[in-house]
């Protein structure tokens, strides 16, 4: 069987940037994206899927690349009006973005799965890649803090990831099952790429689903991860803080340990070349290049490097 597609496990801004580069290097229809749903939440009675939307908007070239989320040229008049009635406004729902959440909630209400809903909606906005939720079952990332347990969006957006983190759990992951489409995508892939996403809250919820992790262990494809860290700091977001809270070394070596049971290669930044020896002893190959993606051209170069491994 000829393996022609590339599978990317994705969540967050780093993944969105990388995918913008990947589709410049390979045909977009040959890209399958398995996306985190641990960030999903409910706001104003609407089903919100932040990572799925960021990936879809990026591939459709509609993402606000300055903020890193939402639609470009967005307005917030509905949000401003909702505040008048006392509705929570800490999660900034844009006017056109609101249509996405309304449509998704309606399709789910009609009985479509999340996978079916995402397929319909991504096609409608011109995305040629296959975007797959990691599961159709509810999996939610929970952050335990001294003040109580928070949903990820409460921790990340409302609290601006300031509280101390005691633990991270994935509610529903033990019962969740990946769709056949996700499992086949991983098993039959030409190459599996772990995007430079937060290993705890973007990739972690997917790996907590047992059959996803099993598929990664069993696939005949090479599995390559791109580090979301340079040195001991995250390129963006709370990855370093969350890794430390979960007992991982805050370094590319710590990222490799998150994926140690299925990873073949990890891509480190040139500034971390000296760390290669601390990873290679674990039989994981180390590749070195510039992993920062300030623009689409840099993302293209990184994608070209990764698929050439």
Report each predicted region and the residues it spans.
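Extreme N-terminal starter segment of soluble prokaryotic enzymes
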Residues: 2-6
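Short internal beta-strands
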Residues: 32-36, 222-229, 265-270
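Short, flexible loop segments at boundaries between secondary-structure elements
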Residues: 38-39, 219-236, 291-294
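Charged helix-capping and loop-helix junction motifs
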Residues: 206-213
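C-terminal functional extensions of proteins
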Residues: 236-309
